[in-house]
Amino acid sequence: MTKHGKRIRGIQEKYDFTKPYSLGEAIDILKQCPAVRFDQTVDVSVKLGIDPRKSDQQIRGSVSLPHGTGKVLRILVFAAGDKAAEAIEAGADFVGSDDLVEKIKGGWVDFDVAVATPDMMREVGKLGKVLGPRNLMPTPKSGTVTTDVVKAIAELRKGKIEFKADRAGVCNVGVAKLSFDSAQIKENIEALCAALVKAKPATAKGQYLVNFTISSTMGPGVTVDTRELIAL
């Protein structure tokens, strides 16, 4: 067994992963996991008490994390004319219109988030089968369909992220790097949790935050006590 494997096993023997921990305790457990050669991402997986088959219970939105994600985003902007020039000036990594649409149709998706001006959505909408499954489709609800491309780019650079429940009612979101201070990780997770609670559909009945787990890229999943999160 490798040294990394032995340390993971030591963590697993020290803690009971069948029980929930407070958010602070869960973060501390991740921090105790063995170091690797890269800065691991802290991921959140939330099972929501919704029925995604119902149109009024499909969860999708965005939230600005107070400390960002620690990830340098590759931002693509669908725009033409003056708006394209604004996007370039604002630091977008890829800017274009029909040329980008055709490139993506060919299978290219080497970017992390897409922004589009409203006039581009007729063409961008044709990319649904490519962008949709990858959560890359711009939407008004997430603020990525907008005439103010400069503001959208700035917000994304500062740590604005999107969240979306899948067909099983689960949201999976990267919220920080493990190198962040514990307090920074905690505040980012609390911001996401508050946004999820705010997005709760009026028609959703019963327990809303069914299961809440945090993990690092190479570490174990730690269940967080949802009673603490609901009380935020």
Curated annotation (Swiss-Prot):
Q: PROSITE patterns given for it?
A: RIBOSOMAL_L1
List the SUPFAM superfamilies hit by this protein, alphabetically.
Answer: Ribosomal protein L1 (SSF56808)
Organism lineage string? Bacteria, Pseudomonadati, Chlamydiota, Chlamydiia, Chlamydiales
Which family, according to the similarity comment? Belongs to the universal ribosomal protein uL1 family.
Q: Which NCBIfam families does this entry report, sorted A to Z?
A: rplA_bact (TIGR01169)
Originating species: Chlamydia muridarum (strain MoPn / Nigg)
State a GO cellular component annotated for this protein.
Answer: large ribosomal subunit
The protein's GO terms of the molecular function aspect are: rRNA binding; structural constituent of ribosome; tRNA binding
Q: Which UniProt keywords apply?
A: Repressor, Ribonucleoprotein, Ribosomal protein, RNA-binding, rRNA-binding, Translation regulation, tRNA-binding
Q: Which Pfam families match?
A: Ribosomal_L1
Share what the entry says about its subunit structure, partners included.
Part of the 50S ribosomal subunit.
Biological role:
Binds directly to 23S rRNA. The L1 stalk is quite mobile in the ribosome, and is involved in E site tRNA release.
Q: Which domain of life is it from?
A: Bacteria
Gene Ontology BP annotations: regulation of translation; translation
- The gene is rplA
Keyword Chloroplast annotated: no
What's the protein name? Answer: Large ribosomal subunit protein uL1
